A protein has these predicted regions:
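Hydrophobic/aromatic beta-strand patches that form the interior of the parallel beta-sheet core
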Residues: 88, 112, 134-136
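Anion (oxyanion) recognition and catalysis
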Residues: 81
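A short N-terminal helical cap/helix-turn-helix that marks the beginning
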Residues: 2-24, 42
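Conserved ATP-dependent adenylate/AMP-binding module captured primarily in the ANL superfamily
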Residues: 92-124
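ANL superfamily adenylate-forming
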Residues: 117-163
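Conserved AMP-binding/adenylate-forming core of the ANL superfamily
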Residues: 23-78, 95-100, 148-154
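Structured binding elements
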Residues: 84
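Short acidic/polar active-site loop segments enriched in Thr and Asp
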Residues: 57, 109, 133
Length: 163
C-alpha cells in the first residue's frame, strides 16, 4: 500500500498495518456482532462487484439511509466509492416528500435503507423517483430485497479487476 489518499484506502491501510478482529461492531437484537478488517474489505469488494453487475458506473449515485450507525453503512460506503460511484447519504428522519426531492435531485439509481420506518417513507414516493431501480434494506423485511442479495451477487470475483 502506498499512501492513504482516498476515503476507501483506510480499510486497506488498516489491514496492512493494524489488522483488527473487531474493526467494526454493530449491536443486533442485543448482541454485538464484530467484523474483522479482512471481512470488511471482502464485503465491500463484493458490494463493488455487485454494483458493477447491476450497471452502476462511475459518478452514478447510490443512496444510503440509516437510522443508526451500523457496519453495513460502512461496507456500502467503501463498496460504492471504490468503483467511482457516489454515495448519497440521506438524513433518516426527513419527510417522504424530502426523500422524493433528494432521490430525484441526486438521480440515485439504488437506495439502501436501514429499517422499516425508513422504507415506508421511501416506498411512499418510490414511483415518483425516475432513476430509482431498486430499494434494499439492511434489516430483513418481508416487503423489500435485503442488502445481502447484493453481497451475494458480488461473490463472483469476475469484476474484481474493475474494483
Amino acid at each position: 500500500m502506498q499512501e492513504v489518499t482516498r476515503l476507501f484506502d483506510f480499510p486497506y491501510y488498516q489491514l496492512e498495518k493494524f489488522p483488527q478482529e473487531a474493526s467494526l461492531a454493530t449491536k443486533y437484537n442485543g448482541q454485538w456482532v464484530r467484523t474483522s478488517t479482512q471481512s470488511y474489505i471482502d464485503q465491500a469488494n463484493a458490494v463493488s462487484r455487485a454494483l458493477l453487475r447491476l450497471g452502476v458506473k462511475p459518478n452514478d449515485k447510490v443512496a444510503v439511509i440509516s437510522m443508526s450507525n451500523r457496519t453495513e453503512w460502512n461496507i456500502m460506503d467503501v463498496g460504492i466509492l471504490q468503483i467511482g460511484a457516489q454515495n448519497v447519504p440521506i438524513y433518516p428522519t426527513i419527510s417522504a416528500a424530502d426523500y422524493e426531492y433528494v432521490l430525484n435531485h441526486s438521480e440515485a439509481k439504488y437506495c439502501f435503507v436501514s429499517c422499516s420506518a425508513v422504507l415506508e417513507k421511501v416506498l411512499m414516493v418510490a414511483s415518483k423517483i425516475k432513476n430509482l431501480k431498486e430499494v434494499y434494506s439492511f434489516d430483513e423485511l418481508e416487503n423489500c430485497k435485503n442488502w445481502k442479495e447484493v453481497v451475494d451477487l458480488g461473490a463472483d470475483e469476475s469484476y474484481q479487476e474493475e474494483v
